[in-house]
Amino acid sequence: LGDVYKRQALIIILVATMSAWIMALILHLQPVGFIKISLPLAGWIIFRFLASFCGVFGFSIMFNSPIPLAVAAASIGAIANTLRLELVDLVNAPPAAAAFIGALTAGILASLMKDRVGYPRISVTVPSIVIMVPGLYLYRGFYNLGIMSLATSATWFASALLIILALPLGLIFARILTDKTFRYCT
């Protein structure tokens, strides 16, 4: 059953990125760098926190999560994703390492909150880290593959793959740290 879900997730990601690439070709759009915005550090952190909260909350609601669960996931996701983004920008951490630390943070926070919110840990952690899935990296990889810029495409795909692998590893490591029964093989 797990392999079926993995294949479905892969198909969804590929179809979404391919659709975005085709629309970009039709509309003559191409990926560009981010616009430089002059904000003090506190402003960046606050806006990233708010955007992360809204993104995770919206994702949770879109998949029919009850409001209390969506708020819990959004709170965890806002903290974890803001930490991830700040690690990349302020400390120049590799994006995959920052994703691992972000997912680890989300997993630890979910473990601390699970009894208070009354939902299983996985119900809170999955929506809280979906915002960390590297959609932009996948899009840039697919776009560059489509225009036959293979070296650039491989770079974006490799970065995306490392981040995608780091997310569940962060959650697993958090579970190992916080759940004594999960640490041992029976």
What are these regions (language model features)?
Residues 61-72, 115-123:
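Membrane-helix interface "capping/anchor" motifs
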Residues 2-5:
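Short, small-residue-biased leader/transition segments that mark boundaries at the very start
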Residues 29-48, 55-63:
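A glycine- and small/hydrophobic-rich beta-loop-beta segment
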Residues 36-51, 92-104, 162:
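Structural signature of hydrophobic alpha-helical transmembrane segments
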Residues 121-122, 126-132, 136, 142-159, ...:
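Transmembrane alpha-helical segments and their short flanking loops
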